[in-house]
Amino acid sequence: MKKILIPVSIIAILLCASWKEDAKTVSPDRLFLADSGKSLFVTNRAGNELIKMSSDGQKAEQKVTLSSPVNAMTQDPSGNLWVVCDGNTGMMYELDGKKLSVQSKTKSGATPSDILYSPVSKSLWVTQRFNNELWEIDPATRKVKTKIAIGREPVAMAPFAGDSCLLIANNLPEMPSTAYPIAVQLDIVDVPSKKVTGRIMLPNGATDAKSV
């Protein structure tokens, strides 16, 4: 049997081409992992959808349509998914991790940009991009427990130091736009004390933070 070798670059082109065929209905925007990396989710921004992909990434297995485009997703220890959606009246959804059925829907500020479940505080943390705040939310009641003032336009966060701290990327510094000596700043939030304990200023030119 004669072997046919296909360069990796061609495979990549074929994959992109197959995805492009669905571009009329799917606008892939963000990727999320759940179930310890065993489940892959992709957002369809144009359709306000969260889609669970097959293990090979070739087809959609399940999907749910939400109020507006999905900005971020996290998973709690029980397996439920928590999703925040874009918009001035942003929404936070609680989804069944297996069926993707909506368990709850809660208004969540002005453009919630990221969400994270903390095993330290056993609560949800949500960055509010146009409120310039970090909210702590009780997942049982879905009520805001704490509001922390942070930098302008927080867009993303990540845990570190054994989940005891959050590193938050802010799109703009805390000063008028006419006086920017720097561009992006990072805030360090201590989860147990619920306080901003540090700030890292990035040099001018480090603009438009998207992720951390």
Language-model features, listed with the residues they occupy:
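Positively charged n-region of N-terminal signal peptides that target proteins for export
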Residues: 1-4
